Amino acid sequence: MENLPIELLRLIYAYCDPPSVRNLREANRTLADLGYDYLLPPNLSVVTWRQDVDRLLSIAQHERLRGSVTSVCIYLGELSYQDAMKNSWFQHFVLPPEERSEILASAWDSYDQIETRRKTVSPLHSRADDLREACSSLPNLTSVEVCFNRYPSENKVLREVFQEVACRKLDRAQTYGNLDAIIAAIDGLRLSSFQIDRLPLELFRLPDHRKHWFAHTHSFESLSTLHLTLDPSGLKGQGSAMRAVNGLGRLLLLAKNVRHLKLAFHPYSRGNSKFVIMFRELLNGFTYTQLTDLILEGLSCEEHDLTQFLERHGGTLTRLRLGGRGLAKSHEVSLGGIHLYSGTFKSLFKGLRTKLPRLERLHLEGIFECQHHELASHESYNFYPLTDENWQPVPCPRWVRSSRNTINCLTFEQYVLHGGPYPGASFAQQHFGG
């Protein structure tokens, strides 16, 4: 086998799973040498209950292995024990008692092991220097994701119960420190993608953390993908919110070359509420000259302000997603829609027909509602998803049924892209739940 061309051997390795790679490397010296490049997956995980920072640092210091890593996902989510116990019992209620007890006992044994290991591992923020050294020594690192909303356990019960928002806990002070460590670790790297699925918005009003972030965001200029899901539940009062939004705006302005932008708000204190945003204050008229894909979720805004923001990107924007799943429970309708406290969706969508000439796809998900219920122009829609954020089709959710008046956005997309009568007028006659 060692007599085969190098190109063919590399092709064979490319189709091998990790155990096969290890076995193949033991065959002879040639295969052992070639197999170095396939020992590691390109995507590495850092989990807070494992010694993954040490592992990452060792890989970064290895001359042959460090070039294999292109992306790192850092998992910071923690399970709320009491809430998870209660929810997991209800999730397995239909099982026979003995089977249910066995499954749940195994799950909580796994949880106990995780928490025992967590106590032996130093918090991420205390390893800031090691994390920075590791990231700066990975020459091909282009993507960093910070994940609070997935639980990387091998136990299925723990993974599933973690999908319930109530089963996640967040130590905000520790989270600030961990995020500070991460943003310092990536400072100066030429990243193409940076994503956080729960960023406490109040971090941008706290002077020390605010200064730290603005001093360590040089990597943002090279980003082509920036996905930020903000948690505004830690804000107290309008002044606090204004300062935090001002800080968020400064951060967004640094990512001036993004092509894919997601800006979502998940209010953990009130899962069905929307966060008020004025784009003219957030971005001060700034235009992303290369923006092709935009996701906006969980906002309350003015129709005119939103239209102006979208119009500025009419020359490049090809795919637009408004709304999303939000913080809905598994049995609930999507909550991350859009609220207009001024204007109507009819006027908004009519304007988009002419202001976004390059638009190819439009997707709506969640509860869309105008402010003034007493007016004849009032609109309220409950959209279920047709595609995921990568525009791949998804099956019709189980929570869709006619009694909930859920509809899909297909007729609205057709209206914006191709014209015709406004579909909102025939809302009551649309097919529900299909």
Predicted regions and their residues:
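Glycine-rich, aromatic-flanked loop segments that form ligand/cofactor-binding clefts
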Residues: 71, 90, 148
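Conserved beta-strand positions
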Residues: 46, 74, 146, 196, ...
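Leucine-rich repeat
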Residues: 36-40, 48-59, 64-69, 79-131, 137-143, 151-179, 200-212, ...
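Acidic, serine/threonine- and glycine-rich low-complexity intrinsically disordered segments
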Residues: 212-225, 229-231, 237-242, 246-261
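N-terminal Skp1-binding subsegment of the F-box domain
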Residues: 1-30, 126, 132, 136, ...
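Hydrophobic regular-secondary-structure patch
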Residues: 2-86, 143, 173-176, 185, ...
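Ordered, helix-dominated protein-protein interaction surfaces in large eukaryotic regulatory proteins
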Residues: 11-14, 26, 33, 74, ...
